[in-house]
Amino acid sequence: MELLKLNRSLPGPGPGAALCRPEGPLLNGSGAGNLSCEPPRIRGAGTRELELAVRITLYAAIFLMSVAGNVLIIVVLGLSRRLRTVTNAFLLSLAVSDLLLAVACMPFTLLPNLMGTFIFGTVVCKAVSYFMGVSVSVSTLSLVAIALERYSAICRPLQARVWQTRSHAARVIVATWMLSGLLMVPYPVYTAVQPAGPRVLQCMHRWPSARIRQTWSVLLLLLLFFVPGVVMAVAYGLISRELYLGLRFDGDSDCESQSQVGSQGGLPGGAGQGPAHPNGHCRSETRLAGEDGDGCYVQLPRSRPALEMSALTAPTPGPGSGPRPAQAKLLAKKRVVRMLLVIVVLFFLCWLPVYSANTWRAFDGPGAHRALSGAPISFIHLLSYASACVNPLVYCFMHRRFRQACLDTCARCCPRPPRARPRPLPDEDPPTPSIASLSRLSYTTISTLGPG
């Protein structure tokens, strides 16, 4: 992305100093421009120091939250067997791209701003520009893949059953990274370190012509913003409609009766029957083996003794005791879709100002520079980088099973030392077994003895 504000918005390399800078470029620079010295801004030292302190604090907070949060996501999704689903595979790729944005881009954007010059050389300049573009492209395409996967799983379950596997998700993720890598090749080709004044270097995009720069900006705006936005809006709109109709017209009893009629009429075991659909025919509840239906959680198979124990101890459902299984699955899907919608909305809110600024600068560089230089462009950059740290917060606040997986992972990494039980004194009576212990003893005895 044309986003690297490397030594662009600070007033200069010294108190009250004028900075010779190109008139054309704004975000990283993409045209040659004419060097002109701007008059120093008349601001107090206290205001300048406060702005610098706020900027450093915000950058540091976003950087730490992005690194810690996305590393936590990668570890939890990698270690938890219950979270190894198709949707979470794309969320894992999204976390890797956000981590790449934080580690490979943020330090090399902040430090040149503080120092007033770019000191890292041409190789780092090209690499930072390339990795930033790849990260944004992978994030966008991953969100599109998640939307299409959820649409297929919820609205087209029979067709999704054929290809909705983790191996297929892995192939899509690899294709996403390869496509993003190829799409962003122009960035390292047309990025270089250029002098912007006396002892001032800048990492800039230098396109062959203004027409090519405008074409590139419009192309990115269409491929990575408008088209993905329309696809995701349509997909989640259809998903919301399907879930709303499923919750409104819940026909478990109708489908059970239809399954019985179908089995009596020669269907093998009533295969493929599930909850009734509002259009009058039964809809199959097809999903991955072991998945509970929300797309972000896998129900691991339990051993036979555990199943027997759950059957013995499970309370008998009565009227009004809670939602039925099919309705509970729909509610779980609805919660996951709501979380994914929040992720999509936050992503586009964070990157909309950057796309708008880049397009404005491509067609009206001087006007964009006058309007956005200084605090506005600093806020735009901070907002775009904040997109790398919002997803972990969304997962923790809106994904109960992810929170539980985080706690389980922390408990596994930092186990508590076992507490020693106090031994009874010789004159004390032995402890009376609790009801739970008696239940386990009785169950073990029954299971061991077997029938008659």
Curated annotation (Swiss-Prot):
Coiled-coil positions: none
Domain of life where this protein originates: Eukaryota
Disulphide connectivity of cysteines: C125-C203
Subcellular location: Cell membrane
Keywords from the UniProt entry: Cell membrane, Disulfide bond, G-protein coupled receptor, Glycoprotein, Lipoprotein, Membrane, Palmitate, Receptor, Transducer, Transmembrane, Transmembrane helix
Disordered: region residues: 256-285
GO MF entry, a single one: gastrin receptor activity
Gene Ontology process terms (BP): cellular response to hormone stimulus; G protein-coupled receptor signaling pathway
GO annotations of cellular component type: plasma membrane
Glycosylation sites: N7, N28, N34
Function: Receptor for gastrin and cholecystokinin. The CCK-B receptors occur throughout the central nervous system where they modulate anxiety, analgesia, arousal, and neuroleptic activity. This receptor mediates its action by association with G proteins that activate a phosphatidylinositol-calcium second messenger system.
Pfam families per the UniProt record, alphabetical: 7tm_1
SUPFAM superfamilies reported in the protein's UniProt record: Family A G protein-coupled receptor-like
Protein name: Gastrin/cholecystokinin type B receptor
Intervals, Extracellular compartment: 1-57, 121-127, 193-218, 361-376
Residues lipid-modified (S-palmitoyl cysteine): C413
Predominant cellular place of this UniProt entry's protein: membrane
Positions in the Cytoplasmic compartment: 79-99, 149-171, 240-339, 398-452
Family indicated by similarity: Belongs to the G-protein coupled receptor 1 family.
Ranges of compositional bias, category Gly residues: 263-273
Residue stretches spanning the membrane: 58-78, 100-120, 128-148, 172-192, 219-239, 340-360, 377-397
Topology versus the membrane: Multi-pass membrane protein
